[in-house]
């Protein structure tokens, strides 16, 4: 880790990535904290986890948060052992000139972000460059979706996901073997979310009328892989309130679950990681 302005006690060297590896430039303290949390959660689940940082063009559409963004913002992805990839949006840039999409090991990112006591408390300590070791682009499992074009299916109470996780953990205690959670449990479709047809989305009828309008609308079938990933990455509270939502969206072969603290993505055509 180094401070590009020689502030905050993290070192004095400045510039782009070192010749021997990749670097990330962190633009605010919140991003430094969130990057460290994401990396440590990923490593806790899988010691071989990867982090992928893909820059967002300035002013690019973003249906997660806002209609436009400043420069220096990226999607930060993390692999999980369940198959879906986790994602947060942060004020981070790939450090090497000309690169807008880099992959590094999550344990390297965890090491250079330190713990909460080493994070500076003011944005005067940033931008800061983090040396993250060798590139791991060839190890990334599959692709990640491009921004835009998502269809929101519906919102589901976060408590539903925590309940599904708790019940599945109970089953897993009895059925798990030396290879971890059984594939049959992970692949099980546990929740079907149906949305209204676009022309009917503004309606608020209940009962049979609402059910009829949902016929022909977007559908998302959620598996335990997504439930475990969303919960294990801490993207929803452990004890959510009754009105805490998880937004479910679809785009072609992709599904996305948006929790308060981050999102998980899964593709029906994307190979899953072994447990």
Label each region the model flagged:
Residues 5-6, 102, 109, 202, ...:
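Intrinsic disorder/low-complexity detector
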Residues 19-22, 47-51, 70-74, 85-88, ...:
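Generic structural motif recognizing short loop/turn segments at the entrances and edges of beta-strands
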Residues 44-45, 94-97, 274-275:
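Short, low-complexity, polar/charged sequence segments that are solvent-exposed and flexible
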Residues 81-82, 92-94, 269-273:
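A short, sequence-level motif marking secondary-structure junctions
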Residues 85-124:
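A broadly used, surface-exposed interaction patch
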